[in-house]
């Protein structure tokens, strides 16, 4: 299960490690920490992932983004709350990839696209992890 962490929304994707195929799953649309983790707990209960993957925002030059510290904190909280292995993965360009995929699927840009964008970005993060696992938390 992968997460595209944001201050307002968290995109979620799931996938099969054997097949290496990720799928968009959900968008958690709240900034309230307890509500976020309750939603994540429900998804973990339902999908029973063996590992969690969190996108780590990076600038194009490889330097950490302003949100990197928040993503690391989120990853540590996931590990502490759910006791599953958590991986951090460079998420450079995942939003660009997600926008392109949605455009190809005919999803128009705008407010309605944002939840789907977060899910597809999480899908891209998970696809990247399948190709090259990141750093364990």
UniProtKB/Swiss-Prot annotation:
Q: Which UniProt keywords apply?
A: Cytoplasm, Hydrolase, Nuclease, Ribosome biogenesis
Compartment(s) of residence: Cytoplasm
Q: Which GO terms describe its biological process?
A: rRNA 5'-end processing
Q: Name one GO cellular component term.
A: cytosol
Uppermost EC category: hydrolase
In short, the EC number is: 3.1.-.-
What is a single molecular function from GO for this protein?
nuclease activity
> What Pfam families does this protein's entry cite?
RuvX
What family is this? Belongs to the YqgF nuclease family.
Q: Which PANTHER family match?
A: POLYNUCLEOTIDYL TRANSFERASE, RIBONUCLEASE H-LIKE SUPERFAMILY PROTEIN
What the protein does? Could be a nuclease involved in processing of the 5'-end of pre-16S rRNA.
Q: What is this protein called?
A: Putative pre-16S rRNA nuclease
What are the top taxonomic ranks of the organism? Bacteria, Pseudomonadati, Pseudomonadota, Betaproteobacteria, Neisseriales
């Amino acid at each position: 299960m992968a997460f595209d962490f944001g201050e307002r929304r968290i995109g979620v994707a799931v996938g099969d490690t054997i097949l290496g195929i990720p799928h968009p799953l959900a968008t958690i649309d709240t900034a309230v920490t307890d509500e976020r983790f309750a939603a994540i707990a429900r998804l973990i209960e339902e999908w029973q992932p063996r590992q969690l993957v969190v996108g780590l925002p990076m600038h194009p030059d490889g330097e950490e983004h302003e949100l990197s510290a928040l993503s690391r904190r989120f990853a540590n909280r996931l590990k502490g709350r759910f006791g599953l292995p958590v991986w951090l993965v460079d998420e450079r360009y995942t939003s660009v990839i997600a926008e392109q995929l949605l455009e190809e699927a005919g999803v128009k840009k705008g407010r309605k696209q944002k939840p789907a964008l977060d899910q597809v970005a999480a899908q891209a993060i998970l696809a990247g992890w399948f190709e090259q696992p990141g750093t364990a938390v």
